[in-house]
């Protein structure tokens, strides 16, 4: 068999075994593997001719690569520095690995890696192992699959943390100089799901936020416009909203945008979220409100209360709800008091957001919110919560990050970028940026727009406002 300038000889017995389409397919795969090895060997020969000055070849070393066409055994040359003094261990180089970007100590090629990482966002690692074997791919243990998923998931988590630090620690723009979108209204829905933990802590909370620009009609159903998911394991609500804000800052300029935030009664949503968006409208998710009302006071009374609330009569709603305490059964008092406490603490969050928007937004198609609940169930709970699964902190963070990329249609592009060469550890890069910023005019640095500074009430936010001369009222 000839291929332009190179001649490759194959064992004719490969084709002699062909009896039908299935054996022909296997023969073609075998020929592809032979061709793969032959080309690699020729490339290794060419690299020997142009080896770096001061290096010498000390022999060949074998390694096995698992590819989409099967396992490939590669025998490539090892090079070391040609020094006179012999050291116990000399660090070597495989020029072939460097040229082809073959990852050290990792046997999977990129095509197979993409497949198993994508499958792992939907199936358990053991199920992925079984699926690959049944499909005729090389045997990959569930432990190796777990290792790859964890590695790339944590890389994505580090990249998100890097962006958060760039925006909130340094104050540097993270938009990559792209033209930012300026929608009149942006919708954010937040929720959390508890998953099992392998350590002392019984459960871990995966926080998830969905942002979209509204709805469009597609046939008889409505579809979210430009939905984006941010999900992960965070140390409190502040870290989540800072990470979320950093991701939004890559896409949007929210200076003149009304931000509608919908979520359940969790404090990290109702109390903390408004601190990060100057023009925020926060509402309690209607599903959770109606559900808790029905559980606490019954369906008939809940309906009457919602009629008062939908009419904009917040005070009457809360007063009537409070007056019902004497007739609430003892077994329902806990949920009733929790609901009443929330309604009295956040009365401004009870009205539907559509009742609080100005007349200038009436021409926009506005509908009820609740996408986050569906996203949590479909994207997180199905993979991470059901079937008695439990996770380490790093494992949960990695899986949530990859599920986020998968949901956003970014998983393959992320894997294709080989980000491990760019963001291994964000701290050294952070220190370099801090050093560089220290040589410049600090007044310019402090004038950078940071989402939290215009509406937050935390002490550190007030201090930064004072340093930078922000005009926002405290």
Question: What residues fall within each predicted segment?
Answer:
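An N-terminal low-complexity regulatory-tail signal and nearby short nucleic-acid-interaction modules
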Residues: 44-105
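Catalytic center-proximal scaffold of phosphoryl-transfer enzymes
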Residues: 1-37, 79, 83-474
């Amino acid at each position: 068999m000839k291929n332009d300038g190179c001649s490759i000889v194959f064992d004719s017995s490969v084709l002699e075994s062909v009896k039908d389409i299935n054996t022909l397919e296997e023969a073609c795969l075998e020929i592809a593997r032979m061709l793969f090895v032959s080309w690699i060997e020729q490339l290794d020969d060419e690299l020997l001719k142009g080896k770096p000055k001061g290096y010498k070849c000390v022999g060949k070393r074998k390694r096995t690569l698992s590819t989409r066409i099967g396992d490939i055994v590669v025998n490539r040359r090892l090079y070391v520095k040609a020094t006179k003094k012999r050291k116990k261990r000399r660090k070597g180089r495989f020029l072939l690995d460097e040229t082809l970007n073959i990852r050290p100590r990792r046997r999977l090629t990129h095509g197979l890696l993409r497949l198993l990482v994508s499958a792992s966002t939907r199936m358990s690692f053991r199920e992925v192992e079984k699926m690959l074997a049944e499909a005729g791919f090389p045997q990959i243990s569930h432990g190796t699959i777990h290792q790859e998923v964890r590695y790339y998931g944590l890389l994505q988590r580090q990249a998100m943390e890097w962006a958060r630090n760039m925006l909130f620690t340094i104050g540097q723009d993270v938009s990559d100089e792209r033209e930012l979108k300026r929608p009149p209204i942006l919708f954010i829905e937040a929720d959390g799901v508890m998953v099992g933990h392998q350590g002392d802590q019984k459960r871990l909370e995966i926080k998830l936020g969905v942002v979209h620009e509204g709805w469009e009609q597609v046939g008889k159903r409505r579809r979210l416009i430009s939905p984006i998911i941010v999900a992960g394991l965070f140390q409190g609500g502040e870290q989540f909203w800072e990470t979320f804000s950093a991701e939004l800052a890559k896409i949007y300029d929210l200076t003149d945008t009304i931000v509608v935030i919908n979520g359940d009664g969790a404090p990290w949503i109702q109390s903390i979220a408004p601190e990060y968006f100057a023009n925020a409208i926060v509402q309690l998710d209607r599903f959770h409100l109606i559900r808790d009302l029905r559980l606490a006071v019954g369906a008939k009374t809940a309906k009457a209360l919602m009629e008062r609330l939908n009419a904009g009569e917040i005070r009457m709603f809360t007063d009537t709800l409070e007056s019902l305490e004497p007739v609430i059964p003892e077994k329902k008092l806990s949920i009733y008091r929790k609901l009443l406490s929330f309604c009295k603490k956040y009365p401004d969050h009870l009205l539907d957001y559509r009742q609080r928007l100005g007349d200038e937004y009436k021409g926009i198609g506005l509908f009820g919110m609740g996408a986050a609940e569906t996203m949590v169930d479909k994207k997180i709970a199905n993979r991470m919560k059901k079937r008695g699964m439990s996770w380490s902190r790093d494992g949960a963070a990695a899986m949530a990050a990859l599920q986020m990329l998968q949901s956003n249609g970014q998983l393959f592009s992320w894997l294709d970028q080989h980000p491990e060469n760019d963001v291994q550890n964000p701290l050294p890069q952070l220190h370099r940026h801090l050093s560089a910023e220290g040589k410049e005019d600090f007044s310019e640095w402090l004038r950078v727009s940071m989402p939290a500074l215009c509406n937050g009430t935390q002490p550190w936010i007030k201090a930064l406002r004072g340093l930078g001369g922000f005009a926002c009222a405290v």
